[in-house]
């Protein structure tokens, strides 16, 4: 099995799941035990600055402006009460996992305090919940043509507007995902 860690999953138009419809998921982990990822294009309608306020983590003014423009994302249907911060590597927070390619996933409160202050990661996404797959489940969904995959890029992850991530990710494959058949074939 080839790991798809540090890849994007792009939902096929035929994916019959209202939660994952037109989703782009960054895969944080993928091994023979399963997979874990964060949906990167489904904003919840909450600014990061509001989340910081709700957690009694006041943001300094300059950094409050950055946090106000950032949206909290619906990271997936699993553990929606848990926060996940996907960010560029800076090694001084608790509960951080190095994902490679200059990215980290942090689940501790201290990274949110940093986002409100002077130690904020250069680029970050804040999500509630994650997407998870059991052993061989993702491989089965890939075989069923539910997802397309591409290597992850920081540009798509951090610089493209949420609503543009799915069409841009599908176009990066060289075609429009709407033109792909939902049926798998064998020659």
Curated annotation (Swiss-Prot):
Coiled-coil spans are none
Q: State the SUPFAM superfamilies in the record.
A: VC0467-like
Pfam families given in the database record: DUF179
Listed InterPro entries: AlgH-like
Note the superkingdom of the native organism: Bacteria
Cellular component annotations (GO), alphabetically ordered: cytosol
Name the NCBIfam families for this protein: PRK00228.1-1
Protein family (similarity comment): Belongs to the UPF0301 (AlgH) family.
List the protein's name. Answer: UPF0301 protein Sputw3181_1330
